[in-house]
């Protein structure tokens, strides 16, 4: 199969880097593939993407063939595992279900609602209201009781303390039984976790979310014939075909949607609906970073992080309802109860929800890096992406949020974690019969580029200060 190597080059917005080349000669081939526009990071960046020439529309501009492209084509799409055998037929015998973007219709298909997750979503806000009402009712009932009846109630409760203890023990036993019967093993990492809602139910629920997103983005969706859409689709196909050792990957019908928006975002719903924004395509440096990002997002869907996070949230919410009822029953005034309610919500958020979310993100980084390695991508580009995001945040003036306040790990922590995983990922990549990587490490190239920028800026500042000093001296001594 004839394949073309399309070089897409972006020029840096920083004038000090206009002469610095990171990968190849400055050139923009196949115009409008990525809308060659200024970038935020490195001066000259070349994208090497292999696309089947028969599937491309006729493009104006020059398309060059080069043997220097990193091969990610069908010749390397064999099944990759610890016992890898060369050749593509193994992958072809286990085809991946892959769907193109459907035409959007305002009247969606009618389907049965997934009962359990939807019921939980509807009842979740009502549970807190009922807990508040119950707590206030208990408080008002206790305040209205005469002193003698309060004393009788205390004596009655003390006489039946063993009944209460037995009831509490029974509830604890039921809760433990529920917990151990809902333990599940992560399909990729083998981690034991609590799973109240099944991944199947959440895939059904995700279809409603997908329809809502399609309605929201219907005016900005890029057609499947657009080269940017083809690039994302090609990367997803390679990731799916090269990771056939993951049983769940063939069970998900992957569907790609590219949204024309400057937002730097990409996400994958549990049912395999992939949404990538053009802002993310402009943010990545090369095809290797895009492979890592899509592998990270696909890992969320494959592991079932949405169902896992909702399960933990459900259990924490049930336990919080008991504490919430006690707060509104014990506090003498509604204002104090509202304050306690707010503190309780923040404690749950910062002690359970956000740390658990960061844990899932770190796991998706690990699995996504492994998937990218089996797809023959240069996994060393993964840490570079997060270093670029760190610089982007600094250049854009965005305030740096402490990690414990965020649902995601900090960029620096992600870089450190990926750097620890790179040697293992490179070994996995070598076992998958991938072509040898260039000796030049993109992490070294990026750090050198940053160093040159800083030195150039420092020299400019010194020259400016020296010039200002001479001007002031000339004014003082004409």
Swiss-Prot record:
Catalytic residue list: 297
UniProt activity-regulation remark: Protease activity is activated upon autocatalytic cleavage in response to mitochondrial depolarization.
Domain of life: Eukaryota
Region (Stress-sensor region) residue spans: 134-164
Official protein name in the record: Metalloendopeptidase OMA1, mitochondrial
Originating gene: oma1
Chain sites annotated for binding Zn(2+): 296, 300, 361
PANTHER family listed in its UniProt record: METALLOENDOPEPTIDASE OMA1, METALLOENDOPEPTIDASE OMA1, MITOCHONDRIAL
Family per similarity comment: Belongs to the peptidase M48 family.
Molecular-function annotations in GO: metal ion binding; metalloendopeptidase activity
Alphabetical GO biological process terms: diet induced thermogenesis; energy homeostasis; glucose metabolic process; HRI-mediated signaling; integrated stress response signaling; lipid metabolic process; mitochondrial protein processing; mitochondrial respiratory chain complex assembly
TM region positions: 163-183
Consequence of gene loss (knockout): Morpholino knockdown of the protein causes developmental defects, such as pericardial edema, smaller eyes and shorter body length. Bioenergetics defects are observed in dells.
Cofactor descriptive note: Binds 1 zinc ion per subunit.
Domain comment, as recorded: The stress-sensor region regulates proteolysis and activation.
Membrane topology value: Single-pass membrane protein
Catalytic activity, EC: 3.4.24.-
Species this chain originates from: Danio rerio
